[in-house]
Amino acid sequence: MQKNITKVSDTEQELEIILTAEEYGTEYNQELDEAKRTIQVKGFRKGHVPTGLIKKLAGPAIEASVAEKMASKHFGTIVDEEKIKPASRAQIESVSYEGDELKIKLSYEIHPVFELNNYSDYTFTKARYTITDEDVQKEIDLILKGHGSLATVDEAALGTDTVIGDVEKLDAAGEPEEGGKTENHHFNLEYLPEDNPFRISLEGAKAGETVNVATTQKDPNTPVVSYRITVKEVKRLELPELTDDLVKEITRQRFETVADFTADVRIQLEEHFGMKSDEELLESISSKLIEENPVSTPKSMVASFANMLVENAKRQFGGKFPKGFDESQFTESIIPNAEKHARWLLISQKIAELNNVEVTDEDIKTYAEKEAEKSTPEQKEEIMSTYQSTEFRDYIADTIIKDKIYDIIKSQVTITEEPTPVPVHKA
């Protein structure tokens, strides 16, 4: 067997495999014998069709099948011998039988060979979110909202109130349009953007007052649409007093006192924003390394990530995009993001390779134990068993490798912490 490898680009190669009749003959004869047994030709008994006629009728199909099997057989061996890292399946580009030789040309994508730029002098800032008593109270108030009640107030509407009013659409002369009235429309101001014209006009309004609202359009050529709202009622959410009994109800007996519940809310906030801080740091790290290492990305790898992003977007719409949604245009728009994902995969694999990162059975066990600690005693044994099962091993191993890679990077760069207030919750 002869082999000729040609570099097409940083991520593409062609491989020519040349086999002698002795090397592919056994497979060819097996295919020919199978054709003799199965092909029926009028005038000949089954299995007794002359070889020459069989070759004439089924020759091209036999040759194609033999070439495919030979390519599959030898490609893996050559990949191992030449230490090739394929990024896609090999495709047969051409097949030729010349004399006693079979020539097969394959094309495929590979992981690019590149040197990783030194990142030891990089500096990153990590947010250290500070949880205050006010943050804890705000979170508790959000929980209590589900147990509150709306009460009518004879006051100017606040940005958190609900305004009920009759809405009339106005014509160009400022008069109500026929059929353009909606009665008892509820405006929940808290859930309207701060720059929403309805929120701006209704904040501060009281029952019995009338306000005018002019909505601007994105298209400057589209005329302004005006409305008149007669405020009939302002409702304000009244939160219940947090008592031990309410705590028991809210938490289904998990906590019995306000103090214990409040302490848990703080712990949950600290854990949440601790994870948020880690995620933001890792995003900064990956973005910097991607920027500093413009590695060529195999098209198949980019396509795989693009497909993943499309499927993730579909799930947000309940499994499929709404009618009229241009999926092809959306897919095209996320290609740059898919390229970043592919580039980061290549960079992280390079870091793992340079640092001999591997996952041991002990790593799997430790990870499973850590996850099991988050569950109830009854679930721990099941979680330990599941996480160490063959079905979950690849997934867990991938997670552990990612964590190890980030730990390696963090140990080699400079990270400074910066006290950061908790972001304002936007409803």
Curated annotation (Swiss-Prot):
Family indicated by similarity: Belongs to the FKBP-type PPIase family. Tig subfamily.
Pfam families: Trigger_C, Trigger_N
Domain PPIase FKBP-type intervals: 160-240
Alphabetically ordered keywords of this record: Cell cycle, Cell division, Chaperone, Cytoplasm, Isomerase, Rotamase
EC number annotated for this UniProt entry: 5.2.1.8
Catalytic activities: [protein]-peptidylproline (omega=180) = [protein]-peptidylproline (omega=0)
InterPro entries assigned to the protein according to its UniProt record, in alphabetical order: PPIase_dom_sf, Trig_fac, Trigger_fac_C, Trigger_fac_C_sf, Trigger_fac_ribosome-bd_bac, Trigger_fac_ribosome-bd_sf, Trigger_fact/SurA_dom_sf
UniProt enzyme class: isomerase
Organism: Chlorobium phaeobacteroides (strain DSM 266 / SMG 266 / 2430)
Protein name (Swiss-Prot/TrEMBL): Trigger factor
Function: Involved in protein export. Acts as a chaperone by maintaining the newly synthesized protein in an open conformation. Functions as a peptidyl-prolyl cis-trans isomerase.
A biological process term (GO) from this entry: protein folding
GO CC, alphabetical: cytoplasm
Organism placement in taxonomy: Bacteria, Pseudomonadati, Chlorobiota, Chlorobiia, Chlorobiales
Domain notes from UniProt: Consists of 3 domains; the N-terminus binds the ribosome, the middle domain has PPIase activity, while the C-terminus has intrinsic chaperone activity on its own.
Entry's localization field: Cytoplasm
